[in-house]
Amino acid sequence: MRASETPRPSRSLMALLPKLVVNDQGQPDFDASDSTVLVSLAEAAELLQRILQLGISAVGQLLAHASVQVEVGEFDQDTVEALGWLLAELGDAAAACVELAAPCRRATADVTGRGHG
């Protein structure tokens, strides 16, 4: 697959989020939002969540195999700490994707025939 054909769900989310209707309190109004936008948001969020989880798993496996290098000091402790913080943020981003996709799916279940949960 060429780079131009690789799905880029984070870019899709950034382009779609401004199209989400918000209420007077600044909260998303999924029922008032366009169903096409909601379906696209859900699809992008779900794909991004899967990509993040697979990436987190891969980095975790690499760290597990690199434990000897960490023990003997071949890897700087700051590097390991930075990876830990990165993994924490990626995990939070994956959870946020699920939290975004779920109400999008609920609001469009009658349109798509696909419910959530």
What are these model-derived regions, one by one?
Residues 1-117:
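Sequence/structural signature of long amphipathic alpha-helices
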